[in-house]
Each structure stands twice: as structure tokens, then as C-alpha cells.
UniProtKB/Swiss-Prot annotation:
It comes from Mycolicibacterium fortuitum. Keywords: Cytoplasm, DNA-binding, Iron, Metal-binding, Repressor, Transcription, Transcription regulation, Zinc. One of its GO terms (cellular component) is cytoplasm. The keyword Amino-acid biosynthesis does not apply. GO terms for biological process: negative regulation of DNA-templated transcription; regulation of secondary metabolite biosynthetic process. Signal peptide: none annotated. Zn(2+) binds at residues 94, 97. InterPro entries: FUR, Fur_C, WH-like_DNA-bd_sf, WH_DNA-bd_sf. Acts as a global negative controlling element, employing Fe(2+) as a cofactor to bind the operator of the repressed genes. Pfam families: FUR (PF01475). It is found in: Cytoplasm. Belongs to the Fur family. GO terms for molecular function: DNA-binding transcription factor activity; transcription cis-regulatory region binding; zinc ion binding. This is Ferric uptake regulation protein 1.
């Protein structure tokens, strides 16, 4: 459990079986927001050294489908994962280092942007990615999980295994 989140209760509420790999994946994504899959695998292996890549991929897919984890994939980037879900927030991505930070919705509730024409769709979410050039990750208080941001913040990544 991290930051008061009841991962066991979350899995139960979503109708998912409670397994050690799923709990470890949820914990890894919570502790390393915006982490790439390889980083999630390394973090999970700190708790479960023998877990396979496929098990982590399966857990990420199940948790994303259940709405417990959000998958984001900025253009030109690999998929990233976070546990901050259901609040319609957006992201800012640094063009130079790839760091990602959360940006709260500009106005109102989901969707916080209104399309000029809904073309017959019932729009319930707007996803915005802001692109920027960071002076430094520290200046932007970036909470990214990229190796570059970790190096800039002096935070060690789990070893690459």
C-alpha cells in the first residue's frame, strides 16, 4: 500500500483477482509515475525477482482495462503508466529530456475542453499534451520516471536486469 491507497480493495472493486504481481505493479506505478514498461518491470523485480516480462505486461493491460492505471503515450514516446486516474488531468512533456509532469485541467470537469462539433459523439474526455523545453527538471518540479529526470533529481532507478 502506498500513500493510503488500498490496492487490494481497488482490485476487488474492479473485479480483478488479487495477485502478488498485480499488487507489485500497482505499487511500482504509484511509486514511479509516468514510468515506461521496462522501468515498471525493474521496480516490480525489486519485490518479485522472478516475475516475467509477460506477467508485468499482462498486469499493466488488466489494470489499464479496469481503469486502475492510466496509459499515456505522447507522440514519439513509448507507453507510460500512472495511477492518477479519473480526474481528467493532462501532461506536459519536455522535448529535450522527455520528462513528463501532470497538469491539472484548465477549467471545469471532464471534459474540460469543448469540441466545436461533436460529430454525433458523446464526448466525455479531452486529452491534452503540452510540449515544452524545460530549463531543468528541478525548475518544473517534474515527477517523471525517465532515467534523465532521475539523474537530474539524484534519484536512483532500480537496476536494469
Amino acid at each position: 500500500m502506498a500513500d493510503g491507497l488500498d490496492f487490494t480493495g481497488m482490485l476487488r472493486s474492479a473485479g480483478l483477482r488479487i495477485t502478488r504481481p498485480r499488487l507489485a505493479v500497482l505499487n511500482a506505478v504509484k511509486e514511479h509515475p509516468h514510468a515506461e514498461t521496462d522501468h515498471v518491470i525493474r521496480a516490480v523485480r525489486v519485490q518479485l525477482p522472478d516475475v516475467s516480462h509477460q506477467t508485468v505486461y499482462d498486469x499493466l493491460n488488466a489494470l489499464t482495462a479496469a481503469g486502475l492505471v492510466r496509459r499515456i503515450q505522447p507522440t514519439g514516446s513509448v507507453a507510460r503508466y500512472e495511477t492518477r486516474v479519473n480526474d481528467n488531468h493532462h501532461h506536459v512533456v519536455c522535448r529535450s529530456c522527455g520528462a513528463i509532469a501532470d497538469v491539472d485541467c484548465a477549467v471545469g470537469d471532464a471534459p474540460c475542453l469543448t469540441a466545436a462539433d461533436d460529430n454525433g459523439f458523446d464526448i466525455d474526455e479531452a486529452e491534452v499534451i503540452y510540449w515544452a523545453s524545460a530549463l531543468t527538471a528541478r525548475d518544473l518540479r517534474v515527477l517523471d520516471d525517465s532515467p534523465v529526470a532521475h539523474q537530474m533529481k539524484g534519484k536512483a532507478m532500480p537496476p536494469n536486469t
